[in-house]
Design a protein with these regions (language model features):
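A generic "binding-loop/recognition-motif" signal
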Residues: 11, 31, 58, 82, ...
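A generic structural signal for short beta-strands and their flanking turns/coil linkers
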Residues: 13, 22, 48-50, 72, ...
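Metallo-beta-lactamase
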Residues: 80-116
Length: 116
């Protein structure tokens, strides 16, 4: 398993966790073009992202998530509360696949087990 910071700070946060079968983007706080550039700099193609996991609704964690998900048909994993708050901040696309999680219980995204 590999873990890579795509960027961290007040301008944006994004991390990638990968194994041989799954590429999980944790948060996506940079705009679409910047996210694609940062992923490419790490040798990661945006279209290969399996899922996006949003930890919370702050702008520096969600800025590019919905655009990236919409462009590459990537599912977004998030809590109902995060979804509700995001929908107040940005236009939510109903074409995106949303997977609602319980922020207090472990869950699986393909081959990666996530424990909150």
């Amino acid at each position: 398993m590999q873990f890579c910071s795509i960027g961290s700070g007040s301008q944006g946060n994004a991390f990638i966790v990968q194994d041989k079968d799954t590429s999980l983007l944790i948060d996506c706080g940079f705009g679409l073009a910047e996210t694609e550039k940062r992923l490419d700099n790490q040798g990661i193609k945006a279209e290969k992202i399996t899922a996006i996991l949003l930890t919370h609704e702050h702008e520096d964690h969600i800025r590019g998530a919905f655009s990236l998900a919409n462009k590459f048909k990537i599912p977004i994993y998030l809590t109902h509360g995060t979804y509700k708050m995001c929908s107040k901040k940005i236009k939510i696309s109903f074409e995106i696949e949303y997977q609602f999680i319980d922020g207090q219980k472990p869950f699986q995204i393909k081959t990666i087990a996530v424990t909150p």
